[in-house]
Swiss-Prot record:
Example of a GO cellular component annotation carried by this entry: cytoplasm
Functional summary from the UniProt entry: Participates actively in the response to hyperosmotic and heat shock by preventing the aggregation of stress-denatured proteins and by disaggregating proteins, also in an autonomous, DnaK-independent fashion. Unfolded proteins bind initially to DnaJ; upon interaction with the DnaJ-bound protein, DnaK hydrolyzes its bound ATP, resulting in the formation of a stable complex. GrpE releases ADP from DnaK; ATP binding to DnaK triggers the release of the substrate protein, thus completing the reaction cycle.
GO molecular-function terms, A-Z: ATP binding; heat shock protein binding; unfolded protein binding; zinc ion binding
Protein name: Chaperone protein DnaJ
Subunit organization: Homodimer.
Keyword Cell inner membrane: no
Cofactor binding comment, as recorded: Binds 2 Zn(2+) ions per monomer.
Required cofactor(s): Zn(2+)
Similarity comment: Belongs to the DnaJ family.
CXXCXGXG motif repeats (start-end): 151-158, 168-175, 194-201, 208-215
Zinc finger residue extent: CR-type: 138-220
Amino acid sequence: MAQSDLYGVLGVAKDASQDEIKKAYRKLSKKYHPDLNKAPDAAEKFKEVQDAYDVLGDEQKRANYDQSGSADGAQGGFGGFGGGQQGGFGGFGGGGGFDDIFNQFFGGGGGQRNPNAPRPGRDLQYQMDLTFEEAIFGKKTKIKYNREAQCHTCGGNGAKPGTSPVTCHQCGGSGYVTTETNTPLGRMRSQQPCPVCHGTGQEIKEKCPTCGGSGHEEERHEVEVTIPAGVDDGQQMRLQGQGEAGQNGGGYGDLFIIFKVQPSKDFRRDGTEIYFDQDISFVQATLGDDVTVKTVHGDVKLKVPAGTQGGTTFRLRGKGAPRLRGNGNGDEHVTIKVVTPKNLNKGQRDALRDFAKASGESVTGSGKGNLFNKMRDKFNEN
C-alpha cells in the first residue's frame, strides 16, 4: 500500500495528531464493522481501516512507515523509547520471510500467528510540563488522560454477561480460511483472514451492551507519578501497565512520560551542571568582597578576591542538579560580570580622576552623562 493510502484510508492528513487518527479510526471501524454494516465490501473496508490504524496509531511504526513509504517497512524498525521495544528491520511484514510467502500459496501457511494468542496493548505518550525547579527537585503529582481500557461489563471478552465467545464456525478457530485457485502451475492454495471472525478465531453470538463486542471502552484514567529529582528536558519515564488494554487477555501497554522543562530566568543548565552570572561593582572587583550568590539550593556567600576580572568563573561544588542515579549533585558555575557605573556624581568623578592620577594615567573623558545629570550635578554644587 502506498504511503498516501494509509492516511487516505483513515481520511486524515499526513501531519495528523494521534487524537485525530484515533478519532477517525473509531468512526470508520464502527461504520464498516461487519456486524453493523451488511454491505458486501464492509468486511474488506473494515480490515483496511484496522490495518491502517495498526501502523499510524503506533508512533514508532508510523515513523518507519513515513520514512520507508510502505506498510511492510513500518512493521519493523528500531525499538522506540530508549530500547523499551526491541525491533529490527522487518521483512515481508515482519513475518518469517520467503518461506511464509511460498507456504501461503502452496498450502503450508506456517508463518501465521495464533489469532487467539494474547497481545499486549498499545503504549501511550504523555507530555508533562515542569518548571526549572520542579525538574531539579522532583515532585509527586497526579495526571489524567484518556485510554482504551478493558470493558468493565464483559471483562474484555466482548460477550454479553452470562455468555462466552465460541469457536468460529467458518474457520474452526484458526482465524484463516483457505481458497484454491487453478493456475498454469497447478492448483494453488492461499490463506486469507476469516470473513466471519476477522481473524480472531472466535464468534460472539451475543455482544456486550457496553462495548459492542470490542472488549474495550474509553476511560479517563488517573495515575500518581513520582518524578525523580534531576530530570531534564526531553527525558522520559516509563510507567509499566498504564497504557491501553491488550487483546485476548494480553496485558496493558506502557505509558511514557516525556518531560518538557521550562527555562529559568536566572539559571542555565547542562545536565547536572548549573550556570549563573553574578554582577559585582568595579570596586568589589578591585578590592575584593564577600558576595551573596543565588543557587537553586538557596543563597550562599562567595569570596571574590581582590583584582578579580570580568569573566572569571568560580565553582560551587554540590550546588548543581541532582544526579538521577545518585552520587550527589553536580556543581554551579558562577561567572563574574563587572558592572561599570553609568551615572557618576561630581564627587565620584573627582575620586576617579585622583585614582587615575595616582596610577599615572591620563584620562580625557569627563565622566559626565546626559543633560539631566549635568543639571543635577550643577544644582548639587550650589
